[in-house]
């Protein structure tokens, strides 16, 4: 992952989540080893009020690896201030069972200088099929 100043924040976020998710789905590498390329060991990601530490994030990768078939990250906007990024993006996915699923994510995140995610606060909501991309 490139350092934050190396690319615009929208591109950094798109690349971060796309390459990470691609590795989760397609690589045979151990989940913990994979995580260490994208997250700090002391990571805390709070999603809709639920805190996820390193162990809970690693555990979350198992069902993602098993069930995710297709995915795309659509970054609507992102703003960087030093090592922090505020962003709004949509995850478009197709799972092993069921139809397409889209989730809007509003995230405030802190990264290390070398691009590892240290902390994130996320609010998410399901996006209805056909809802405009801006959606708010």
Where are these regions (language model features)?
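A beta-strand edge to alpha-helix "cap/lid" segment located at domain peripheries
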Residues: 1-8, 62-136
